[in-house]
């Protein structure tokens, strides 16, 4: 493969694995900027609960693809893909090397494979109807009207089932067939972090976000956007919201957030094993190994 092709370095791993810190070190050594791939960090006003790179970290290295929209405006995969490609192309024009850092597997896969999702906006009333029907019947419906997409979706995956049905009823076509796929013109080096003490790191991260102002951040979001904001149902914010309502004491909120985060990390690792093929870095000295692998590819 021609070394003149641009190189995209992907640093992936489950939540709390240390991607942000290592990504910054790699960027500093190579003179790069970071393109964040996190489905919640694209939203403004959501810093603590999403473990967004701090202001100090952003001063050290410029980060792109964060704070793109207010949390009451949906960032679709199509929107993200389009914005990310422009951002990456700008970086590649300057250095011929781009650095992606994140744990949102579906976003990473779409971006690195060149798969562009259809630009069909979500339709709340239709989604409510599907929710009322229930996932089992929704999946059977999908198998009937769009068997091609159904084969790629787990029967329990209500989010992707709903989206596939939404696209089909809006266009009359399969979501799978509507997705345009054009392999991007770059080389790809995927590096992975999966520390053996991940559960301890998650527990510490959970303690930190509550101590550092998650409750206050959640109160701000409720005051600005209302209790019905969908993102308030995500990990951490949901527990903080229940605590604010007096439905959950602090210790239970921390416990539930920790539990849900570990479950999420497990799903992330399953995705990375099935959809990506990263070189898993030695946890004792990941920076040294990462730089060695990168220099071998660049040469």
Curated annotation (Swiss-Prot):
One of its GO terms (molecular function) is tRNA dimethylallyltransferase activity. Keywords: ATP-binding, Magnesium, Nucleotide-binding, Transferase, tRNA processing. It holds the Pfam family IPPT. InterPro entries: Dimethylallyltransferase, IPT, P-loop_NTPase. Residues 38-41 are annotated as: Interaction with substrate tRNA. Gene3D superfamilies: 1.10.20.140, P-loop containing nucleotide triphosphate hydrolases (3.40.50.300). The record marks 104 as: Interaction with substrate tRNA. The keyword Nucleotide-binding applies. It catalyses: adenosine(37) in tRNA + dimethylallyl diphosphate = N(6)-dimethylallyladenosine(37) in tRNA + diphosphate. Its EC number is 2.5.1.75. GO terms for biological process: tRNA modification. Its cofactor is Mg(2+). ATP binds at residues 13-20. It is an enzyme of class 2 (transferase). Substrate binds at residues 15-20. The keyword Lipid metabolism does not apply. Monomer. Catalyzes the transfer of a dimethylallyl group onto the adenine at position 37 in tRNAs that read codons beginning with uridine, leading to the formation of N6-(dimethylallyl)adenosine (i(6)A). Belongs to the IPP transferase family. This is tRNA dimethylallyltransferase. It comes from Prochlorococcus marinus (strain MIT 9211).
